[in-house]
């Protein structure tokens, strides 16, 4: 085979693999003025399907799913004033929704039962 052709094929394969392994967070969807954020809670940490960058003040619906085999919880506060916005327990595999008003102060959330660090989101516009 032609060495140039082999090199081009190898580069094409590497480029294709690099595209297929990149993952992009979804943008938060807004319906009827409410922005939805999905949070999956695992043992000691949260994962989100949507990016938390560039959020705007407004009404948010957090859909939290307990992905562990034990009782956990969800707590959300105003990031500046530490005002409690919502707090509740989640049984294993349970999903609950928290609808809150987020201001330009930002917000922070954590599990108050299974110690996790505060996830502080202060870039809300």
Give names to the regions the model predicted.
Residues 26-47, 90-125:
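Extracellular/periplasmic metallocenter environments
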Residues 49-51, 85:
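Surface-exposed, proline-enriched loop/turn segments that connect beta strands in immunoglobulin-like
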Residues 51-70, 96-110:
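Beta-strand cores of secreted/periplasmic/IMS beta-sandwich domains, seen most often
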Residues 10-18:
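Bacterial N-terminal signal peptides
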